[in-house]
């Protein structure tokens, strides 16, 4: 299979023989769902990456971020508060799974600027508390801003501040799928 995990491992081994002016680490972003946690655990234990990023890309079996169909299949058929609650429930389980070193784009569910219908601050506090307890990093990811024009450049300001208050390590990320998106919009993020 082209672009398989084996191809990636071969690339890592080849690159580890090279010398770079910066520290280069190799990791993997893994799509997490509570239903696939045991499968992920059985697969991931066979690999040794420098880091593993766990991300939630779907809610109730539907991708929440695909312009072509997410609004039709998910957002227009469900109460936004239920979507947000399911998303953050999955984030909670991702953290508690102990499979990952960091959470990818932990508040990207906001990308379409749809009102959740409830105050997210208790959720932010709960997620921050869990992140601290499980010693997992949280991403301050710029992709919702540059891809979906969300006004938040990275994390919601209140969420970021709550994470900082809880001494949760925050990792800057751009979710680059193309070289041109590496570090995109980092200059707009609040200085740490």
Residue locations for each model-derived region?
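Alpha-helix N-cap and loop-to-helix initiation/capping positions
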Residues: 1-7, 75-86, 115-122, 148-155
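Acidic (Asp/Glu)-rich catalytic clusters
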Residues: 9-21, 41-50, 95-99, 127-135, ...
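A metal-dependent hydrolase metal-coordination microenvironment
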Residues: 1-64, 69, 74-77, 81-82, ...
């Amino acid at each position: 299979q082209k672009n398989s995990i084996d191809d990636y491992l071969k690339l890592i081994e080849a690159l580890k023989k090279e010398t770079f002016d910066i520290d280069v680490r190799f990791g993997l972003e893994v799509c997490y769902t509570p239903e696939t946690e045991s499968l992920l655990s059985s697969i991931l234990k066979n690999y040794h990456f420098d880091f593993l990023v766990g991300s939630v890309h779907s809610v109730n079996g539907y991708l929440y971020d695909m312009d072509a169909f997410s609004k039709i299949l998910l957002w227009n058929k469900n109460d936004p508060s239920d979507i947000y609650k399911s998303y953050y429930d999955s984030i909670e389980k991702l953290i508690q799974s102990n499979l990952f070193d960091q959470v990818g784009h932990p508040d990207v569910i906001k990308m379409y600027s749809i009102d959740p219908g409830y105050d997210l601050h208790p959720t932010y506090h709960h997620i921050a508390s869990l992140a601290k307890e499980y010693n997992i990093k949280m991403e301050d990811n710029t992709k919702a801003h540059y891809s979906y024009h969300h006004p938040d450049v990275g994390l919601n300001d209140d969420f970021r501040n709550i994470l900082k208050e809880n001494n949760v390590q925050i990792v800057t990320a751009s979710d680059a799928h193309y070289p041109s998106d590496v570090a995109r919009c980092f200059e707009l993020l609040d200085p740490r």
